């Protein structure tokens, strides 16, 4: 559901493109499409293509997605000339995970697979790392462990406040 008309959305996308600005769609609509099965997912990707969307985000933490399905969706997006941003992290929304149960190596392997399948970028989700830590120290060690596996030009970071953003700029440029 959107409160903007299809025409106003199309006009905004045209303005972005005329100024060399790429347009992305975040994970929630893709998550809904994936829940609907392969036909719905392909239909959603076709709609993104028709609207001129440049990037789509696929989350590896908002839902369970196995490696084969992840690769299949990335390839389907690439066939439509839509670049993929893969979201990785340790928590989604306000879920709680214990620091000892983060499965970091699995997150890294899934991100590597996504890049090999054709994903353009890796987005490191802040939830549980620098956001919603309930007074506990930020998990810069986990962020470094994930990020050190990828070239900086293929990394994006979610930053929920100015201090976190400044730290990312200091460390990663």
Language-model features: locations:
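Active-site-adjacent beta->alpha loops and helix N-cap segments on the catalytic face
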Residues: 3-16, 32-43, 60-85, 95-96, ...
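Short, compositionally biased "basic patch" segments
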Residues: 9-19, 112-117
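Hydrophobic faces of well-ordered beta-strands that scaffold small-molecule active sites
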Residues: 21-27, 56-58, 84-88, 122-124, ...
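Hydrophobic/aromatic-rich structural module bridging two neighboring secondary-structure elements via a short loop
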Residues: 23-48, 55
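Catalytic cores of alpha/beta
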Residues: 36-44, 103-115, 161-172
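Conserved anion-binding
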Residues: 49-131
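C-terminal alpha-helical cap/extension of soluble enzyme domains
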Residues: 145-173
């Amino acid at each position: 559901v959107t409160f903007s008309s299809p025409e106003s959305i199309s006009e905004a996308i045209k303005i972005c493109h005329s100024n060399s600005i790429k347009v992305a769609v975040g994970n929630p609509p893709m998550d809904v499409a994936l829940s609907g099965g392969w036909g719905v997912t392909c239909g959603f990707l076709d709609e993104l293509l028709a609207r001129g969307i440049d990037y789509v985000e696929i989350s590896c933490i908002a839902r369970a997605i196995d490696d084969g399905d992840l690769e299949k969706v990335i390839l389907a997006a690439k066939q439509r000339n839509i670049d993929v941003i893969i979201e990785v992290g340790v928590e989604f929304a306000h879920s709680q995970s214990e620091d000892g149960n983060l499965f970091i190596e699995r997150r890294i392997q899934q991100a590597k697979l996504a890049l090999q399948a054709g994903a353009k970028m890796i987005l490191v989700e802040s939830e549980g790392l620098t956001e919603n830590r309930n007074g506990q120290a930020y998990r810069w060690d986990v962020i470094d462990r994930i990020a050190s596996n990828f070239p900086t030009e293929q990394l994006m970071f979610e930053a929920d406040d100015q201090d976190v953003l400044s730290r990312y700029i200091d460390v990663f440029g």
